[in-house]
Amino acid sequence: MKIYKAAIIGLGPSGLAVNKIIYGNTKDEIIAFENSDISNRDNFFGFWLTDWMKPFETIIEKKWNKWTIGDAKTHITHTSNHKPYCVISFKKWQNYCLDTQNNLKLENKQVQEYFPFKDYFKIITADKKEFYAEKIYDSRSVKEKNGELTQNFFGINIETADHTFDEKKLTLMHFTQESDILHFIYILPFSHNRALVESTVFSKNVFDEIWFRKKINDYLKLNNINNFKERGREKGVIPMFFSDVAKPLNNNIVNIGIRGGACKPSTGYVFSFLIKQIQLMKNSNKHHVVVHKFIERKMDKIFINFLKNNKESGKSFIKLAANLNGDEFQSFMMGESSFLTKLKIVKTMPKIPFIKEIFN
C-alpha cells in the first residue's frame, strides 16, 4: 500500500502553487487529483506587482503601467510606475509549477470523499479507487449561494487589423448601462493587434455565452472593430462572498484557494492572494492562515452588501477611481491600502446607503 506525502485535490492554480512552493524543492512523492482536462485551459490571471508576487516576475507575460476606468462619458486614467498591472497565463503557471524536484503523480479522477485512516488519510474516488496520503490539500470549488453575488465573465482572445489597440494601456473597467446589473468590459491589449476582450457581470445570476458575446460585439462595433479573428476564449464564475467552509480541526487537512478564503470578494481577485496564502502556509507551517486583514474583510462585506442592496451602474467605481491615484487604487485592490487611503475610499462612497450597510 503506497502512502503519499500529500494529496492535492484539484490541480488548478492553488493546487499547482502547493506543488511548487511547498514541495517543489523536496524529493517527496505527491499525488494530485484533477477530473477535468486542464491541458486545454489557458486563461489569464491579472494582478498588480506586489512584493509577494515579485518571485514570479520571470513568467509574467505582459505589464501595463497605465489603466483606465470609465463609461461612455468619463475616462479615468491611472498610472503606477512601481507596481504595474500584470498577467500570467494558466499554461505558463502550470509549466512553472510542474518544473520541480519532487515526484508528482496525476490522477484524472474525481475525489468523492476522504477521511482519517490510521496515521494518514484514505481517499476514495468516484470510480471507487482508494489512495492514501499523509496530508490533504483541498481546493474544490465553493458552491454558489442563493442571493449572493458572483462575478461571472466570458472573454475572447482576438486578432485584429494593425494598430487597433494601445498596447501600453489596459481597460480595467468600461461600464455599460444595463437595466438591473453591473456590467463592464475588460481589455488586455497584448500588442497593437491582439487582445483579450472580456465581458464581466456582478450579479446573483449566471449569464450564458450568448449574452456575453452580444455585449462584447456591441462594444467592439462601437469602437469600429468589425473584423477580427477569434484565437481563444475563457470564462468563469468567482464568488463575491467569503468562503464559509469550516476551518478543518485536523491539522493535516488544508483548504486552499477560494475554499480556504484566498479570494478578495469585493474585486474578485484570487490568483495573487492564493499564492500569498500558500507562501504564508509554508513560512508559518500552519494549516490555516488569514490572507486578508480584519479591516479589509469588514470593508469588503460592507461594499458587497451595498452592491447587493443598491442599483449600481458603475458610477461609484468611477468616482472612487477619480479620487485615488494609481498607487492608491492598486493598493486598495490588492488589500494593502493605508489608513488615509481607506478614509478616501469611505468618503467616496454614497453616504446614506453606505452608512446603512455599516450598521446592517
Each PLM stretch: what is its role?
Residues 279-360:
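C-terminal helical "tail/cap" subdomain of flavin- and related membrane-associated enzymes
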Residues 1-14:
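Beta1/beta-strand and adjacent pyrophosphate-binding region of the FAD-binding site
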Residues 14, 38, 142:
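Conserved Rossmann-like nucleotide-cofactor binding loop
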Residues 49-109, 114-119:
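A conserved beta-strand/loop capping segment in the N-terminal third of enzymes
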Residues 17, 21-74, 154, 158:
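N-terminal FAD cofactor-binding segment of flavoenzymes
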Residues 243-307:
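Conserved mid-domain beta->alpha element of the FAD-binding
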Residues 178, 182, 236-255, 264-265, ...:
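FAD-binding beta-loop-beta segment adjacent to the flavin cofactor pocket
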Residues 11, 100, 104-228, 241-245:
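Predominantly flavin-linked oxidoreductase catalytic cores and closely associated redox partners
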